[in-house]
Every structure is written in structure tokens, then in C-alpha cells.
Amino acid sequence: MIIGIWAEDEAGLIGEADKMPWSLPAEQQHFKETTMNQVILMGRKTFEGMNKRVLPGRISIILTRDETYQSDNEKVLIMHSPKEVLDWYHKQNKDLFITGGAEILALFESELELLYRTVVHEKFKGDTYFPSTFDFGRFKLVSEKFHDKDERNSYTFTIKKYEKVKQP
């Protein structure tokens, strides 16, 4: 299954200088539990915004147009087109999580079957927004879980799960 997973603020902001403008340990735990032992796909800028840190327990694919781009980490696969990613994915027995950034989510929109969308109930300053052209009408909201702020999480947020609507 191909799954989108991301967090955004109330205005759809997903990043500031290729990083997330908030830190929410409970949301990070949700991401970890949801993607563990699966494949995550992100763009080069998102990967570099994480200081090229590889998330343990997952296969990481970095999508870049730069044909010369390399990673020092053997657990990172570098690919150069959506077709290359999909050809590789169809030979696997794992889910593929599209984690961002905005360009990568937009590239794979038509392939997405399930969405995990975290909405942080605040407005931040940043430079990258979730694609405004994304068609949520193709999906049905199936669950929401609200998280209140606490000593570890400075903001309230809601994790929303959507399933692709089956066409008759």
C-alpha cells in the first residue's frame, strides 16, 4: 500500500527551511510506530533538513533529480524518478510511506491509498505548504485522534486517517 504521512499546521504549513517548525514527541511516536519496518520516501531537501539522519528500522528512499547525489549510508536508496521508486516498490512486500516534502507528496498524489494527516492546532511561520491542489475528495475520513498539550507536547494536535474512496 502507498501511504501519505505528514504533519501540517492550521494553515497547511509543513516546513521551515526544510525542517518541521514544531517538536511534538507524541506525534513523532505515532510516526515511528506507523512507519516501523516499512519503507519511507522523502525528497532530498527533506533528508538534508534531517541532517541526513537515517531513521532506524526503516528502508529510506531519497528522491532527487540530481543524478550525482549519493549517500554515505548503505541503508539509504537514492532514486531519480517516481517510476524508479514505483518499479522498486512493486517488487517489495512492504508499505511505502510518502513523508514529504510538498513536491514529493504532489508527485505521488494519484498513487496514495491511505493518508495519515496530523494537524497541529497552531499557526507557524515557514516556507513550505502542503500542496493546495491536493484532492481530499478522493478520500474518506475514517478516524481522528485528538492529543492535548502536556509537559512534553507544547501544542494540541489531531491525527486524521483517511482511506481512498473505492470507485464503483
From Swiss-Prot:
Q: Which UniProt keywords apply?
A: NADP, One-carbon metabolism, Oxidoreductase
A biological process from GO: tetrahydrofolate biosynthetic process
The pathway noted for it is: Cofactor biosynthesis; tetrahydrofolate biosynthesis; 5,6,7,8-tetrahydrofolate from 7,8-dihydrofolate: step 1/1
Enzyme's top EC category: oxidoreductase
A single cellular component GO annotation: cytosol
Q: Which residues bind NADP(+) per the record?
A: 6-7, 14-19, 43-46, 63-66, 99-104
Which GO molecular function entries does the Swiss-Prot or TrEMBL record give?
dihydrofolate reductase activity; NADP binding
Please state the Enzyme Commission number of this protein.
1.5.1.3
InterPro entries hit by this protein? DHFR (IPR012259), DHFR-like_dom_sf (IPR024072), DHFR_CS (IPR017925), DHFR_dom (IPR001796)
Please tell me where substrate binds in this chain.
5-7, 27, 58, 118
Q: Which CDD domains match?
A: DHFR (cd00209)
Q: Which PANTHER family match?
A: DIHYDROFOLATE REDUCTASE
| Functional summary from the UniProt entry | Key enzyme in folate metabolism. Catalyzes an essential reaction for de novo glycine and purine synthesis, and for DNA precursor synthesis.
Q: What is this protein called?
A: Dihydrofolate reductase
UniProt source species? Lactococcus lactis subsp. lactis (strain IL1403)
What is this protein's gene name? folA
